[in-house]
Amino acid sequence: MADTAPQVSFKKRSVKKTNFRKKPESPPPDADSDSSFTSSDDEEGHRIKRRRKNAAVSASSTSNTRRTTTSDEPATAGAAVPLTASNDATKHSNWYDDELNEKNLLGTTRARPAATGADAPDGTYKGAANYQSFIQKNPNAPAKTFGPIKAPTNVRTVTFMDYAPDVCKDYKLTGYCGFGDSCKFSHMREDYKQGWELDRDWEVSTKGKNLGGKVVSQRGGQAGEDEDDEEEQLENIPFACIICKKPYQNPIVTKCGHYFCESCALQRYRKNPSCAACGAGTGGVFNVAKKLNGLLEKKRERARQRREQAIANGEEVSSEEDEDEDEEQNSS
């Protein structure tokens, strides 16, 4: 009997039926009643009091206000700044304004009577303020302003005074520049004078003389008409070698028509076979410049004539030109 297990039975408890009160439906509140509470009676006589619910929903809570303020801040911070037209390019410089002069700001000390017409004098002296003008003025005449004239306010001028112009060193030493007309430096070999010195020299040179032409370019007489191709050729020939910056030693000429020293041209050809002046290929062809000495002699003669003419006119001659002439004569 010990092997038999005891039987266990579970009792299922039944759920007690409880009497739940059914809440009766409350009648709708009157629309005219102002009280926020409503009351109703149930079946057993108990009075139930309910709070009246507002039909309208108010959204004026603190959290909503904070959210609205926070959401509005980025919109205000990211708003585009309004652009204002400055018109700096066409801005006027009103240094003196007619509306802000002393007369309009301070006013006149004494108001003069309006000119109604000249009356016949009755012999009574009424003071200097009552003087009358019997001159009939033209009412249509424009008003005259006295004093300095007002300068335009919408015009800007930029003045650059170049007292020491940059001179091309290659052109000043040799008379040749590889850049040609595109060189940014001045191709000049003379000294510079102030404006009053130039005016003085012009007055001294033209005093008591009849000038040949009506314009400045024709006042040299027939000098401008005698220029020919030879003059242009002489101007294009450097008076010194552009490689060594010294007078020509055994000059040679290339196929492109440029002159160099023989030693300078051969030494350059070992490293660069192109022409030192124009960059064209020489091909190793260097001819003896037989006519160069004659051309340079003509160029020196014309420079000497111009120098003598300048001295005769009372003009100053650069000392560098004298040194160049001495060196050329010594080398020849």
Curated annotation (Swiss-Prot):
Molecular function GO terms recorded: DNA binding; zinc ion binding
Function: Involved in pre-mRNA splicing.
Provenance organism: Emericella nidulans (strain FGSC A4 / ATCC 38163 / CBS 112.46 / NRRL 194 / M139)
RING-type Zn finger ranges: 241-279
SUPFAM superfamilies noted in UniProt: CCCH zinc finger (SSF90229), RING/U-box (SSF57850)
Stated family: Belongs to the CWC24 family.
Record's compositionally biased regions (Low complexity): 55-68
Feature: compositional bias, Basic residues: 10-21
Protein name: Pre-mRNA-splicing factor cwc24
Database matches in PROSITE patterns: ZF_C3H1, ZF_RING_1, ZF_RING_2
Location of the region described as Disordered in the Swiss-Prot/TrEMBL record: 1-95, 299-332
Keywords: DNA-binding, Metal-binding, mRNA processing, mRNA splicing, Nucleus, Spliceosome, Zinc, Zinc-finger
Record's subcellular location: Nucleus
Taxonomy, superkingdom: Eukaryota
GO cellular component annotations of the record: U2-type spliceosomal complex
PANTHER family from the UniProt entry: RING FINGER PROTEIN 113B (PTHR12930:SF0), ZINC FINGER PROTEIN 183 (PTHR12930)
Pfam families with a match to the protein in the record: zf-C3HC4_2 (PF13923), zf-CCCH (PF00642)
Subunit-structure text: Associated with the spliceosome.
Zinc finger (C3H1-type) residue numbers: 162-190
Broad class of where this protein is predominantly found: nucleus
